[in-house]
């Protein structure tokens, strides 16, 4: 996911700078990129027209998203990229959306911790709404959360 596109350029550089990726970019599936202490998924898995998935796509992908989360172990922080990911993640958890506000680099006191970022879409990065420095700061903060979290070997609490 995000391999070979402009969003991926921003994302993988930030992951690399924070120690979550073995290299600062990924151009193709088998280019040697290895993630460490990280898992990348999406609420919708198809490239949506107009950069926004349709509600039907999100509904269709939700069982896969839920299953992926249920398989993860030792989750200490979830970084959501964009408001759609934020809303979808909270819905999957059964949380009231009105109890949480989305904002860049906003941290929510959940277990695991929930850290928000603007999506690294070409629209956001070309307009300066999201800069490389801003995204790097989010993943550096995620790394700090992991370092300070107590050790545990529990599945993601869904």
Residue ranges and their predicted role:
Residues 1-148:
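A polyanion-binding, active-site-adjacent surface
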Residues 144-158:
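Generic C-terminal helix-cap and adjacent flexible tail
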């Amino acid at each position: 996911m995000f391999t070979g596109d402009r969003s991926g350029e921003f994302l993988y550089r930030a992951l690399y700078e924070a120690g979550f990726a073995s290299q600062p970019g990924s151009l193709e599936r088998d280019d040697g990129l290895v993630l460490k202490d990280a898992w990348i998924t999406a609420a919708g898995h198809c490239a949506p027209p107009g950069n926004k998935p349709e509600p039907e796509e999100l509904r269709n992908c939700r069982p896969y998203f839920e299953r992926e989360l249920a398989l993860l172990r030792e989750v200490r922080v979830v970084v959501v990229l964009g408001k759609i990911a934020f809303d979808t993640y909270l819905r999957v958890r059964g949380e009231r959306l009105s109890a949480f506000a989305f904002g860049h680099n906003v941290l929510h006191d959940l277990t695991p911790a929930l850290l928000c970022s603007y999506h690294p879409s070409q629209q956001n990065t070309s307009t300066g709404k999201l800069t490389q420095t801003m995204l790097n700061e989010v993943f550096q903060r995620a790394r700090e959360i992991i370092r300070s979290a107590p050790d545990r070997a529990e599945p993601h609490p869904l």
